[in-house]
Amino acid sequence: MTKLIVICGATATGKSGLALNLAMRLGSVILSADSRQVYREFDIGTAKPTLAEQQLVPHYLIDVCTPTETMTVADYQQQAQALINSPLLPHSPAPLLLVGGTGLYIRSIVQGMKIPRVAPNPELRSQLESLGQSQLYGMLQQVDPVASHKIHANDCLRTLRALEVFYITGIPISEQQGEHPPDYPILQIGLDCDVEKLGLRIRKRTEQMLADGLVAEVEYLCKKYGLELPLLNTLGYQEIKQYLAGDISLDEAKELIVLHTRQFAKRQRTWFRAYPQIEWFDADDPDLLEKVWQPVQNFLDNSN
């Protein structure tokens, strides 16, 4: 019987580390729920699990498409559900672990979101992208105010997708969405910590990314794919791109990454806190693994 354990929360709360420890103890595999880790070559800036970590525990839904391709929530849902239902996935009787901070990815699985199956239209996207994010968001507010309330004004990818769905189908994306929860048992675990401690975690991780070669990664990606690649305008990459262009210093780029990541984490916390099914744990608890282990055991005992 399929059983799913979700580990979610804001960025830099230690989800991947907890998931690795749980997976090794349970004999489970990990399904990533991160909207940027699906792309190959975007490694350091997305905090993608290392090859060593992936050798310890099998990871899925990482490196599944090229940076020039588009992974929609519908694409992710389809691939994730196929894996969850696959008799070939080596997890039974252990539960699957769904791990990440992309709320829509997790919601698409846990709540069985009904998502419009609208293929990306490169020509339409190109026309829309030329208008700039500010104008695009204003357009979204006009054609789909419900979606605009759920999408941040700086979220280029989701704004673009919502407009794309509207202009192709003539129906707002918010009207095409519904929910059909799966019939298998699900345990949802959330990690959180004090805001100031989270800020320190974010700063430490940003410094580690820079030490691991983030600048070289961004430079390589800019040369290979061009400066206009949408992924290079996302968190951690856009700031280094500004540095490489000579617009800001490396220290300024670092501080911007920290600031923007803290802002992003705040939005993530707000998103996940809206779901009462999530059982929360302190990411800084030295006994975190054992604290989490108790509800995991209860979940497995009660779902057999």
Predicted regions and their residues:
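Phosphate/pyrophosphate-binding catalytic cores of soluble transferases and nucleic-acid-acting enzymes
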Residues: 1-304
